[in-house]
Amino acid sequence: MKVLVATAEASPFAKRGGLGDVLGALPIAIKKQSEIDIRVVLPGYSAIPSQFKSEFQPIDSIIIPLGWRAQKSRVSSYNFRNVTFYFIENDYYFNREDIYGYFDEAEQFGFFSKAILDIMPLLDFYPDIIHLNDWHTAMVSPLLKYKYAHKTNYNQMKTILTIHNLKYQGIFTPHVLEDFFDLHDHKLQHDPEYLEYHGQISFLKGGLIFSDAITTVSPTYAKEIQSPELGMGVDGLLHKRRDDLYGILNGIDYQDYNPKTDVNIYRNYNLPDEGKTNEKLINKLRLQEDLRLPVSSRVPLIAFINRLVKQKGLDLITYVLPELLESEEVQFVFLGTGDPHYEQYLSYLAEKHQNLSAQIKFDEGLARKIYAASDLFLMPSLFEPCGIGQQIAIRYGSVPIVRKVGGLHDTVYPSISEEGTRGIGFTFESFNAHEMLFTIKEAIQYYHQKAFWQEIINNLTTIDFSWEKSACEYIELYHKLIHRNTNSTRKESYLK
């Protein structure tokens, strides 16, 4: 079996968020556990680190037509951890300082989607399955049906679309379908059963309709996006395609995120860390010193490492933070960037309170230090497709405090439940500041009960969020899709 994974990001080449983490690790895990010939294609951004780019192997140049345009592009390859990565290089679209945020994103990623299909003869690689990720590559599915399905080597291909965050759908003006892809079918642009989305068109919706299967990054999120509350306007479509919708929990790279070997942290350690030296505690004391927090082993240190946006629960946090700092003996460290009013407010509180450090930036090395140093990790998201922060925190022995939503619900088992069982964290249900406040205070209370707390830490060490289980589920889905009757695909029956 041959699989081509298409993505806008893949670590360590290009990463701006969780998408890059997933696509840098999942294909490697699949390769390790199967005989599948899995390869990855992504844009050849100029921002790719030079230590990789200097080792790229040129394959050839190719002209990619995009409507009336003819873009000369170069295709290169690089073998990373036994997986071939292809890079589509184009000076006009990808020679930019950043990956996202440009006015011509429809054209930029429309080009990438078209190029994915056009370079296959050059590579002499025709996959059985193209595994697409988010809106940046979702147009491959309708393009395959309308422009390539009649061609030899393309007519048996299947597509899977993974939704990493339904909020981002690639919404553009309808004319782009004709302008970039020569798709003149009126219903594609104007029929709500197709790509039309409130007078615009949605690249992601094209993938949701025409892909043979849809996955998302946790079982709970797969259910949530079929509801009006979290379906982002396509809940009806997702409900209709529920038999083709799979929730597969993301993992993290245990080779990369490993407190025993992480070169970024102050002192490497094993969990549970109960010895006389208590290496994890040394990380805490060193971080407090570096961030100019009062140095204390007794005071619980709560970390927040995320984007400073409403989705991540900043409205709840900023509402209760002054009360917590006044009423509890606790320290907070924030690391991230986002909406200016959150950045400014946290900076203001940090000047006012000695027990709060606001690091308004993103620094991977500092993030690792904070994971290793913190006692608790706060993630009270409004919605959360999967979440990587709580998984990394658990790996480093930081006890999560989360809202029970999406992947947070699937990964954090409460330490106190109605049955009295002890799990790995603290959870709350409603998106409510006072409910979160109560849960944080409860966690602080249990932090000081050392025997109970040590039991939670011991429980953390039994959790495995490595990619092996997720990879097995994707392998199973690939095989299921390959053996599905090509002449009766679900996408066709849905549109009739």
Swiss-Prot record:
Reactions listed under catalytic activity: [(1->4)-alpha-D-glucosyl](n) + ADP-alpha-D-glucose = [(1->4)-alpha-D-glucosyl](n+1) + ADP + H(+)
InterPro entries according to UniProt: Glyco_trans_1, GS/SS, Starch_synth_cat_dom
Enzyme class: transferase
Gene Ontology MF: a single term: alpha-1,4-glucan glucosyltransferase (ADP-glucose donor) activity
EC numbers: 2.4.1.21
Residues binding ADP-alpha-D-glucose: 15
Source taxon at top rank: Bacteria
Keyword annotations from UniProtKB, A to Z: Glycogen biosynthesis, Glycosyltransferase, Transferase
Pathway: Glycan biosynthesis; glycogen biosynthesis
Gene Ontology BP term (one): glycogen biosynthetic process
Keyword Amino-acid biosynthesis found: no
Family the UniProt entry places it in: Belongs to the glycosyltransferase 1 family. Bacterial/plant glycogen synthase subfamily.
PANTHER family registered for this protein in UniProt: ALPHA AMYLASE DOMAIN-CONTAINING PROTEIN (PTHR45825:SF11), GRANULE-BOUND STARCH SYNTHASE 1, CHLOROPLASTIC/AMYLOPLASTIC (PTHR45825)
Role according to the record: Synthesizes alpha-1,4-glucan chains using ADP-glucose.
HAMAP family in the cross-refs: Glycogen_synth
Protein name: Glycogen synthase
